[in-house]
């Protein structure tokens, strides 16, 4: 819940983490606000900025401010993106734009930071969360157009099916994996 786009706030979070734990081994950027469900024609600049600032800019700042510490520990970064960007989901223009920006930023960081022993990857999850339930209630048309039961027959479990993969991506067994997008959508995220 430290998703901020203010440099001073982000630096304070990083400083507090160092003060508390003495090091940073991993950064996981997974929080973002957006006006999902609002079409491009009806989107306002404030709605668009909400997604870009809370998603793309916050991810950039946390990566940048944590970099010196990640370099020391040869740490890992996992950034969350979305099928909304991969597939151009209806009514999710600002969310998709922010998430695809995060994917681009992640690939650049993988190229720039690989020499420092830092691996940077992307997870695109589909899990039943309070946010997805709120999206269903607030924008039923967009929900119906975009969210379908995965071939796995259930939505992902946040802790078991998403969280465990994130932990592995931050661990020593996956250090060679760098700049990759992992879709955890129960078969919905199949790509060529």
Where are these regions (language model features)?
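Catalytic Tyr-x(3-8)-Lys segment
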Residues: 140-160
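Active-site helix of classical SDR
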Residues: 63, 98, 106
């Amino acid at each position: 819940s430290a998703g901020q786009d203010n440099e001073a706030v982000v630096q304070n979070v990083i400083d507090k983490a160092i003060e508390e734990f003495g090091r940073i081994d991993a950064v996981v950027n997974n929080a973002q606000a957006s006006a999902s469900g609002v079409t491009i024609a009806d989107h306002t600049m404030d709605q668009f900025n909400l997604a870009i600032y809370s998603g793309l800019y916050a991810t950039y700042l946390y990566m940048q401010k944590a970099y010196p510490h990640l370099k020391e520990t040869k740490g890992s970064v996992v950034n969350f993106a979305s099928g909304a960007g991969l597939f151009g989901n209806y009514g999710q223009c600002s969310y998709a734009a922010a998430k695809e920006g995060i994917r681009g930023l992640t690939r650049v960081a993988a190229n720039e930071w690989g020499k420092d022993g830092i691996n940077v990857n992307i997870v695109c999850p589909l899990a039943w969360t309070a946010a997805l339930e709120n999206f269903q209630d607030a924008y039923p048309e967009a929900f119906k157009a975009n969210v379908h039961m995965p071939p796995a027959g259930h939505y992902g479990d946040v802790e078991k099916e998403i969280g465990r993969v994130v932990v592995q991506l931050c661990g020593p067994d996956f250090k060679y994996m760098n700049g990759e997008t992992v879709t955890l959508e129960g078969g919905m995220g199949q790509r060529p």
